[in-house]
């Protein structure tokens, strides 16, 4: 039986007066890739940001309902948000390495969390870059500025930076939309590999990508979760007309 790692219960979100999410109930299974699909503005990125409370940073956002991580509501008053974001990491749409060396990018999180020992940091940096399939390309130039890397390399560096603090869940918001096809393929292969160790939730506009890499797919429309299921079922035998229309390209 696949374990539920995270789960949302009756999750509603407002930006000021405008409601953006409506009663979202969604399980996220451990060591699986869950893809969130739907047309622009349907709420999938807003939903993703609820999973590590990044919406807290936006003024006038109000949230009702629960987001459970291992059964505990991450919106409870006693939750340390920094600790939460260590457990639930994020990779953004546009590669956003810090303007510092490749090494310092990866060591950034571990240092914040108190690791000072050079040997230990060296180990973490090598481990994370290997996990992100970047080590062989950069091992001889770790002190080079990260901004000099190609777009695809920068995104793999951002993945290495995210996993360096050993998160349990990795959120990815359209991680390949700014990349060329070859870099995209590398990131997709990497996601499948990382799912052996992490629970991954990915927002994607690319339907082929969702069908290639994910185990489960959730289809959002106008702030509502229309359908959720195993990816193969959603793509080959959707139960809802709206899902079928979107997947077959009749709208979106």
Swiss-Prot record:
Pfam families: ABC_tran (PF00005). Its main location: membrane. Its EC number is 7.3.2.1. CDD domains: ABC_PstB_phosphate_transporter. The keyword ATP-binding applies. PROSITE patterns: ABC_TRANSPORTER_1 (PS00211), ABC_TRANSPORTER_2 (PS50893), PSTB (PS51238). Residues 6-247 form the ABC transporter domain. Part of the ABC transporter complex PstSACB involved in phosphate import. Responsible for energy coupling to the transport system. Belongs to the ABC transporter superfamily. Phosphate importer (TC 3.A.1.7) family. The complex is composed of two ATP-binding proteins (PstB), two transmembrane proteins (PstC and PstA) and a solute-binding protein (PstS). This is Phosphate import ATP-binding protein PstB.
